[in-house]
């Protein structure tokens, strides 16, 4: 992973998760995201539309982008199959978020963590401003 891509992952707490509805239509929603070098994680209640979509079809796309336009648009795109984490894993990822921002938002108490492995960089598609990963 490039340092620029790592910086985008480290500096952005909100991204977009794209899933597929039962009728095949796309569903995109903003989520709170935290990452490490292996994966991106987000938190959602299991009753939300995107969480229900993941149970049915785990293939997702996650996008994070830099809002600092003075350096031009920069983004990270990760495609693959999401995993629903169990209670123990969710607790560990909540600790990762809490360490990053200094607290755990109260609405996260009922949230489940989801994981998408970052995987390999797609060098053919990636540019100097956008990095594409697939797992």
How would you label these PLM feature ranges?
Residues 1-3, 48, 99:
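Charged, amphipathic alpha-helical segments
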Residues 9, 54, 96-97:
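A generic structural signal for nonpolar/aromatic side chains embedded in well-ordered alpha-helices
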Residues 12-46, 62-65:
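Short beta-strand segments
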Residues 21, 64-67, 105-112:
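A short, aromatic/hydrophobic, helix- or strand-capping loop or linear motif
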Residues 36-37, 49-52, 132-133:
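A short local loop/turn or secondary-structure capping micro-motif enriched for an aromatic residue
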Residues 50-76, 83:
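Helix-adjacent hinge/juxtasegments
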Residues 73-135:
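Charged, gly/pro-rich active-site loop segments
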């Amino acid at each position: 992973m490039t340092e620029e891509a790592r910086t985008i992952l480290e500096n952005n707490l909100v991204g977009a998760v794209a899933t597929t509805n039962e009728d095949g239509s796309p569903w995109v929603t903003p989520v709170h995201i935290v990452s490490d070098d292996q994966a991106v994680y987000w938190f959602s209640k299991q009753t939300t539309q995107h969480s229900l979509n993941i149970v049915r079809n785990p293939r997702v796309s996650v996008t994070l982008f830099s809002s600092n336009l003075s350096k031009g648009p920069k983004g990270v795109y990760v495609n693959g199959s999401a995993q629903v984490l169990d209670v123990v894993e969710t607790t560990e990822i909540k600790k990762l978020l809490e360490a990053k921002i200094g607290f755990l938002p109260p609405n996260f108490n009922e949230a489940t963590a989801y994981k998408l492995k970052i995987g390999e960089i797609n060098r053919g598609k990636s540019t100097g401003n956008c990095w594409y990963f697939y797992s």
